[in-house]
Amino acid sequence: MSSRKVVVSKARVAVLLTAPLWLGACGSTTVVDDYRETPVTNLSHEEAVVVLGRRHGAGQDTEIDFISCVGNELSQGSSALAVIPEKLFVDSMYPYFETSTAPMDVKNLDRLIQNPAIAEKFAEYRLRFFVWIDGSTETVDKKGSMSCAIGPGGGGCFGFASWDDEANYEATIWDFKNLALAGKISTETKGTSYMPAVLIPIPLLARVQSNACKSMADQIHSQIGTPLR
């Protein structure tokens, strides 16, 4: 079962110091695709989730702060999940979840747990779901210019700049209990940030990565379900 939704996030900011009025709005739009392989499962309060980033090499890694953001979002609120921090998990499982050795599909987990030490560690963590996230946030276009100078009477910056950011991420959810693919989620977030400067630069930022994180976490939560207390 698959679904798609669009989330528009817009922040309006009053810009002083003669900045044009149309600079008072910057925002982002998020498109979410959701594919569910299995029905929503309610975890027991003892079961845990680990969120991991795919690491491909220099310049292609999923950002560590994005993985932390998704994990933090999942572990907050009245329906908080038990989330194992990525670094803690990877370090404790060394070297089985490093870049060159991490399992690439759920079938490889079955082979991995044939190792008694790995099986024992998984049981200790009470792992139920692995969430693998692949993707990144990039600046795709820049416009405008800005110059700053310092003189005897003081200094300042003048000009205008804008840039477009795109965040593209895909999450694959593995159900460790059933050794099956639970579902996939993809998010695409786009936004434009502005920086007018009349003496002082005023950044008006579109929270592209932050909005992508929240949308991703919401959809992961909807697939995994609510812990049973």
Language model features by range: what are they?
Residues 2-15:
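Bacterial N-terminal signal peptides that target proteins for export
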Residues 27, 70, 147-149, 156-158, ...:
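Sequence contexts marking disulfide-bonded cysteines in secreted/extracellular proteins
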Residues 55-59, 89-91, 136-141, 189-192:
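Solvent-exposed loop/turn segments at secondary-structure junctions
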Residues 103-177:
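Surface-exposed short loop/turn segments
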Residues 14-24:
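Bacterial N-terminal signal peptides
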Residues 26-110, 217, 221-229:
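A structural "domain/chain start" motif
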Residues 152-221:
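Short secondary-structure boundary motifs at beta->alpha junctions and helix caps
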